[in-house]
Curated annotation (Swiss-Prot):
UniProt GO cellular component terms: extracellular region
Keywords carried by this UniProt record: Fertilization, Secreted, Signal
Species whose genome carries this gene: Homo sapiens (Human)
Intracellular or extracellular location(s): Secreted
Signal peptide bounds: 1-28
Primary localization class, coarse: secreted
InterPro entries (UniProt xref): LLCFC1 (IPR031684)
Regions of compositional bias (Polar residues) in chain numbering: 38-49
Region (Disordered): 27-51
Functional description taken from the UniProt entry: Sperm protein required for fusion of sperm with the egg membrane during fertilization.
Protein name: Sperm-egg fusion protein LLCFC1
GO biological process: fusion of sperm to egg plasma membrane involved in single fertilization
Length: 122
């Protein structure tokens, strides 16, 4: 039977990683209860909103230019997604580093007295 300490360190290391890597199903994909994918029809309010978004115009000098509001929303959502992805990567790296530091990680072999000094002072 292997010692319990390495298994505990491995569990402490894997739990934050597994929590950070949660995978959520997409809206269009069938869930675990659904075997088939159903097509949803948009309501009249959504159709009206799409109609208004596509026919907004702006004045540029003496010329009129059609502005596609849906395209602007897609650009904004892609920028927001990039920011969220970057912040997720940053938090993942920080969590991984903190787990390695607090569990001893590679510092345990190099500096074995760090843990002893910490235990003596606290």
């Amino acid at each position: 039977m292997p010692p319990l300490a390495p298994q505990l360190c491995r569990a402490v290391f894997l739990v934050p990683i597994l929590l950070l890597l949660q995978v959520k199903p997409l809206n269009g994909s069938p869930g675990p209860k659904d075997g088939s994918q159903t097509e949803k029809t948009p309501s009249a309010d959504q159709n009206q909103e799409q109609f208004e978004e596509h026919f907004v115009a702006s004045s540029v000098g003496e010329m009129w230019q059609v502005v596609d509001m849906a395209q602007q929303e897609e650009d904004q959502s892609s920028k927001t997604a990039a920011v969220h992805k970057h912040s997720f990567h940053l938090s993942f790296c920080f969590s991984l580093a903190s787990v390695m530091v607090f569990s001893g990680g590679p510092l345990r072999r190099t500096f074995p007295n760090i843990q002893l000094c910490f235990m003596l002072t606290h």
